């Protein structure tokens, strides 16, 4: 037995200088752990609700109410429970909140407690978190989907697509993939300088130049890959997070690159991109409630590119089930704070995998030094992780943790590589 004995919480700052919640858990055997909660810039309407204070303090973004919720309601609800009974702990959290969207106590309060309990239980068991959650067979290191050029809500530029990523699919190990990604990142900086473009950074560590549009951004990254001597499409592939909900309006459709477009016109644009560039994955290409558009797009290009539901699914098993039934998307983005407990996150991943959907573990734009998602990526065998550029310590912390996990696994470690993208078949 590893009984939860004490639960504490505090307000800390995330990578954007905004407050977030950190929760600490002490077990009766002396095991101790903490977890910090991330926060998004572009958030889906269907996400679980963060509890913020409002008012003048921290421009309304304080989380003292969420901290108080942990101390006054969550702690009494879970103290005395065996920390290794994660599903029981998380059900106690859900019962304490009592709302479908976690709006009373806040998903940020619930998630902090849920993850801290899991980390404490792993500590008590003498296991690394990835092994504790994933069991004896957890051994696959994910492909890092490195956001090296930022636009949309992550940068103050005119680029509508939110993230342009490189995926080192041809590397033999995670260690090699990280090196390749870092080399492309630095090569991109050189390319931008040569062309007189800005090299300031966006929220997630990627460069944020004000370029003309999607194709120019992809061309710049292609040049950067070439500079390193790596082969585009074989060693390194490309990926996008469009975050289309951010530029969709009822009545006018998608205001994208200077014109209003329909879902069909957006689909035609993506089909053109997939034929012209080695793109393995497109996230949120359409609005979070445009089910018909998603289904049509999946029918059109889902056989040759990964279509990832982020705002569409918000890591919610019920939303994902709806997508599976309708045939919308073919992959799930996994963000623990979208749903608010570890158990619900694992349930969503399990549902995705059982139905042939790929999964990509993901950070948020507002991150901390917490490395939980690195362990979870290996634990669930997602084969893909999105946690920003190979720069800024809150991003690099996750990559460095994956290096440690790969080293820990030794000869048992396997890098997912191109196998993570079975639909990818770029012909150039």
Curated annotation (Swiss-Prot):
(2R)-2-phosphoglycerate binds at residues 162, 335, 364-365, 386. It is found in: Cytoplasm; Secreted; Cell surface. Pfam families: Enolase_C, Enolase_N. Its cofactor is Mg(2+). Binds a second Mg(2+) ion via substrate during catalysis. Pathway: Carbohydrate degradation; glycolysis; pyruvate from D-glyceraldehyde 3-phosphate: step 4/5. The active site is at 204 (proton donor), 335 (proton acceptor). Transmembrane segments: none annotated. SUPFAM superfamilies: Enolase C-terminal domain-like (SSF51604), Enolase N-terminal domain-like (SSF54826). PROSITE patterns: ENOLASE. It catalyses: (2R)-2-phosphoglycerate = phosphoenolpyruvate + H2O. Mg(2+) binds at residues 241, 283, 310. Its EC number is 4.2.1.11. Catalyzes the reversible conversion of 2-phosphoglycerate (2-PG) into phosphoenolpyruvate (PEP). It is essential for the degradation of carbohydrates via glycolysis. Belongs to the enolase family. This is Enolase. The lineage of its organism: Bacteria, Bacillati, Actinomycetota, Actinomycetes, Mycobacteriales.
